[in-house]
């Protein structure tokens, strides 16, 4: 199962090639990392230029995934998954498209998903975790066909990023704006496990009034690759833009309804007994009932090996109005007012709470609600050699969650929002107010060869929590930092080579909801509230970018010092959902090197490689206790943080034909803080190939594409930590992993009218 690569020769070649290389003519001021929304087609038919991955002129490590990359993956693939080619980025999922939210996890330089920041056209998405309390996942925020580009800052994002969780990097998604030309785009995908996806988009084109708009609809249906149950989603996206002289007024609206059936979480012990293909019992109701009574069959030996069924339901509404005002040639003010509502439920058929004396199973539902609204405003003022940026972000968010139990009499369908529970053991409600301000200056010197960027932000987050029912915590927590500085510079060593370095301090606000400090008992919360401190990080990058003819690349060294790391230690199985133990384990130290090179080998061929070595470990950690057992994690590697990542991909395009083969290596990971249960490393490869058919009857720009994922049909653990992390698991019985999808194939046809 574990295939260790021989990376040393390749890594040496890569680093040697990059040491004398890197891109850099003097760039634009160090503005927010996301590029402006672009009028880009669904598919770029020409080979992308080699300079689309590495972002020039930035004082930090910033890289870009273009529409071309997004178009080469199967339609419906999470934009997050396309980032796994970049250095420092680890993405994992149990499904081929990376869209199954329970399993979709991303980490960057050892910082996990809830320590990163995410935005869509500048609108905050929160930390995009499964039980998100202040945002939503990108797969629900926008159809993947409407994403124009994704920009990653691996170290520390721009000061203006609207996020209170970006201890590590930031990910900025930029949508495809309304097209200048009128037309209808249609795309149809069919594939493995009865997958079909239909996408249609209408663009008005630019009207005589200066107005342009688009409206798109998406429907996706598929079965799970193992077990029983559907994976379904419907989406509507719309945007309108109005030119007002030199200014632009726009409005957007996005709606998503999602129904995904869960895969069963696995342990090492379960896989040894039952195999990677084992899943929940559905549609075998009698087997689930017998297991709930302690009568096991087929290798099952405990109640938590499987349940009858699990499901996640999510409905989201995201909309807003944006105004870009350009009162002078050197002054720009961009303001966005947004609102977001979410209604969600997660269902688990639990054998721990019976519906009646005759039925030993009930549906345990966790019900989520989010209602938030906010405003972001960013000012840019160019004054000679200086570019001043200032901005403010303000958000008010209401979040609630409850745990309820619903009676069932048999295997009836529960693919809907339920009502009339027989028990409500837990209910919490939270109100969160966020205010963030930033100010920075970017100065250009030495005829533009040197660019110095410096500034700060202050962040104030107040959470008021009320425990309405049950044994969880209520109270108030404030996370305040008046001065979080950031500084960096770029220096053009030549017209082709650029040195960059940056330093930044960041803070992560406390998390309301079912995770974080409020997931403790009230007694534990009261004991910790006076001493708890928000997590903070200090990050340093230094690197070089180069561009020499058909080659471009970057190499960076980094160090991150992460203080007051809060661990939520699971104390029981996920379906029982006990209060967690919150432990401050002191400090996490991260050091590493990451490199990437993009080569245009010939007019038809290109080759991209990236390599990461990341060492993240716990430091200065006080010993904590689980019962009477002391736990010392000092020197242990951070959970779910692979030390080695490597990606390679070869692309070819000629006379309308195109193909790409990629392979990704993910190193060993851990799900225990004491590192006693390593998860094996693995290789994963994929293929994309197709032909640009051109015009066929009324259709133009027609493209036929085949995608094959997991080419070698590897068996591997795709996701680690679905049910959290534990101190130790020497017997391998803690079920917190998901098997990765086997080989799957998808065929897509898209065209424009």
What do these predicted regions represent?
Residues 310-347, 358-468, 474, 492, ...:
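Face-selective signature of the C-terminal outer-membrane beta-barrel domain
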Residues 1-86, 203, 319, 329, ...:
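N-terminal Sec signal peptide and the immediately downstream disordered periplasmic leader
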Residues 241, 248-320, 347-362, 411-418, ...:
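Acidic/polar loop-and-plug regions of large Gram-negative outer-membrane beta-barrel proteins
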Residues 131-136, 145-149, 154, 158-238, ...:
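Outer-membrane beta-barrel translocator/receptor signature
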Residues 6, 13, 490, 501, ...:
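Conserved C-terminal beta-signal and adjacent last beta-strands/turns
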Residues 29-32, 385, 389, 446-447, ...:
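Gram-negative outer-membrane beta-barrel transporters
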Residues 40-181, 542:
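Acidic, small-polar-rich N-terminal luminal/periplasmic segments of exported/outer-membrane proteins
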Residues 322-326, 332-338, 344-348, 492, ...:
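Membrane-embedded beta-barrel scaffold of Gram-negative outer-membrane proteins
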